[in-house]
Amino acid sequence: MTLLMDYMRGTRANKKGESSQTLLSPLKVDNFGKQVRVGFYHHPDTGMLKGKYSSGPMKEIFGIHHMKAHVFDNNLLVTGANLSEDYFTDRQDRCMVIQDCEPLADYFDDLIQVMTDCSFNVDNNGDLRMLPTYPEPYKEPKKFRNQMQHHIKYFRYNHKTEIPAGDDL
């Protein structure tokens, strides 16, 4: 299982001191180890912010990860907001379920894996670490962008598909 979320939102603690990182780290540390990946994507531009915009919710305005795709087997759920009860009862027009579409589910699963590779990952101690091949995005943003661009190009090349004439989408 892979969980990918935004670094700024996922590490920001609530009034109780809880964050997505503190709530999800036990999945990796105590329970499932190598069966679980928990990644926090950190946009490289947020490291350049200074002063009153350098922490808290204000920082999220300048660079937040908004991919909201959920892959289950060969099914894909694309949403526009949180996975909350209110969202699925009052705002059903903002989600789409695509069932039994293995190529699309594989595409999104691979995209999530690539983005998780480019993210801070919860290690076996519950700490956030980049993979050894990646620089930290806020310390070396240019190097990070170049590495990520290469990774995304490779992903796009692997998923390049030609649709035969006469086939419907």
Model-derived regions, located:
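Charged, low-complexity intrinsically disordered terminal segments
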Residues: M1-K68, F72-L169
